[in-house]
A protein has these predicted regions:
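Surface-exposed cleft-lining segments at the edges of enzyme active sites
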Residues: 18, 125-129, 183-194
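N-terminal, active-site-proximal structural segment of metallo-dependent hydrolase catalytic domains
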Residues: 1-94, 174-179, 193, 198-202, ...
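Alpha-helix-centered segments that form part of catalytic cores
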Residues: 132-138, 190-203
Length: 220
């Protein structure tokens, strides 16, 4: 029997609750909570959710908990990216909030597509050896139980931005490059990270199709 789903994705742009940081979390919540509520999403994918720390406890997503408080999402199943220590990353976590049970969760980062090696040609001092170029954040892959023996495969991904990656000796300050060539190489490396991770997503999708006997794709 067909099922109707509302899936939504939302980049919350470094959602955090740092003291004195503007705009204040309360001000952001006043704007964002009504927007998220209006989505009425069965499954909500979020990007750039920062983690917060409490003394003696693992880093968690406290700012997100405050954002969804009092909304239907407060009772949803949750999966998010974690460090090797099992706690949320300090910045830019991926999160899935689901009305349906999350049956499995997996992080993928240079697992299906190994890190390429590259020697920067504009670095100061010059690099003599190639170095690994890895993705900046993982892919979050979850499966959801839709009932009646149906599984939804969901991939939440936040690709590298087009902002040039740093090149040793080529930055005067955070916003100023020493040479256009240095800027161009930084842009190239960012492109390498972005396209490489997109390749890893494509490989993952192909593996899902191979491993599952019955796959339905809805493009609506």
């Amino acid at each position: 029997m067909p099922i109707s789903l509302r899936l939504a994705t939302f980049n919350v742009e470094n959602l955090d609750d740092k003291p004195g940081e503007l705009p204040l979390l309360a001000d952001r919540i006043a704007v964002m909570r009504p927007q998220l509520t209006r989505l009425r999403a069965d499954v909500l994918c979020l990007q750039e959710v920062n983690g917060q720390e409490r003394t003696g406890q693992p880093r968690t997503l406290l700012a997100l908990e405050k954002l969804i408080q009092g909304t239907p999402y407060e009772t949803y199943h949750v999966s998010h990216t974690v460090t090797t220590g099992g706690e949320a990353y300090d910045v830019r976590n991926l999160v899935v909030l689901s009305r349906f049970l999350i049956t499995a969760s997996q992080q993928i980062k240079n697992t299906l597509a190994p890190k390429p090696r590259y020697r920067k040609v504009t670095a100061i001092p010059a690099e003599s050896d190639a170095e690994d170029i890895g993705w900046e954040r993982p892919i979050l892959y979850v499966t959801l139980d839709l009932g009646e023996n149906r599984t939804l495969h969901l991939i939440n991904v936040h690709l590298k931005s087009k902002i040039p990656s740093d090149i040793s000796g080529q930055k005067i300050n955070q916003y100023t490059w020493r040479t256009v060539a240095g800027w161009a190489e930084g842009y190239f490396i960012s492109s390498m990270k972005r396209v490489g991770q997109a390749l890893e997503v494509r490989i993952l999708i192909d593996r899902i199709f191979v491993s599952s006997q019955k796959i339905m794709v809805n493009t609506n």
